């Protein structure tokens, strides 16, 4: 299973925010500069993460973005569930005439559940704690 760029960049943005010391605020512009992605694309991602409570966005002169809750409580599986369309195949009568007898959909759904259960074992904090090479790459001190 390959994650969409939307989910990939969402995870990257969260990793960047989790890497900042003491819940420091950052900006969408800073995140897009670090990863070299489109600002418009990142705005959509941050908006969805904000609606999900994973990012807190503060408007105004001293505004910015930061994690909406502690990194220790943000499970990677939950982020993927929030950002990723998890339907692997389109099983409807109009697209496939074997849908009533097909068992593939159940197998694929179970595979997705197993994938998410594995991701649920890790938090955002697990991705960033005691990771000096990451801090160096992100230019976070």
Swiss-Prot record:
A Pfam family assignment: Rrf2
Gene3D superfamilies reported in the protein's UniProt record: Winged helix-like DNA-binding domain superfamily/Winged helix DNA-binding domain
Obligatory cofactor(s): [2Fe-2S] cluster
Residue ranges the UniProt entry marks as DNA-binding: 28-51
Domain of life: Bacteria
GO BP: negative regulation of DNA-templated transcription
Positions with a binding annotation for [2Fe-2S] cluster: 91, 96, 102
Gene Ontology molecular functions: 2 iron, 2 sulfur cluster binding; DNA-binding transcription factor activity; double-stranded DNA binding; iron ion binding
Role of this protein: Nitric oxide-sensitive repressor of genes involved in protecting the cell against nitrosative stress. May require iron for activity.
HAMAP family: HTH_type_NsrR (MF_01177)
NCBIfam families (alphabetical): PRK11014.1, rrf2_super
Record PANTHER family: HTH-TYPE TRANSCRIPTIONAL REPRESSOR NSRR, WINGED HELIX-TURN-HELIX TRANSCRIPTIONAL REGULATOR, RRF2 FAMILY
Protein name, entry field: HTH-type transcriptional repressor NsrR
Organism per entry: Pectobacterium carotovorum subsp. carotovorum (strain PC1)
């Amino acid at each position: 299973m390959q994650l969409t760029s939307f989910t990939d960049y969402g995870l990257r943005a969260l990793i960047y925010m989790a890497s900042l010391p003491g819940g420091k605020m950052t900006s969408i512009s800073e995140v897009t500069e670090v990863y070299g992605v489109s600002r418009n694309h990142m705005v959509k991602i941050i908006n969805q993460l904000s609606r999900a409570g994973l990012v807190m966005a503060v408007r105004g002169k001293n505004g910015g973005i930061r994690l909406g809750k502690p990194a220790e409580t943000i499970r990677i599986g939950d982020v993927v569930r929030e950002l990723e369309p998890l339907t692997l195949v389109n099983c409807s009568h109009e697209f496939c005439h074997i849908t009533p007898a097909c068992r593939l959909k159940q197998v694929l759904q179970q595979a997705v559940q197993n994938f998410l259960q594995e991701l649920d074992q890790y938090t955002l904090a697990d991705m960033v704690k005691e990771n000096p090479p990451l801090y160096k790459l992100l230019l976070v001190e």
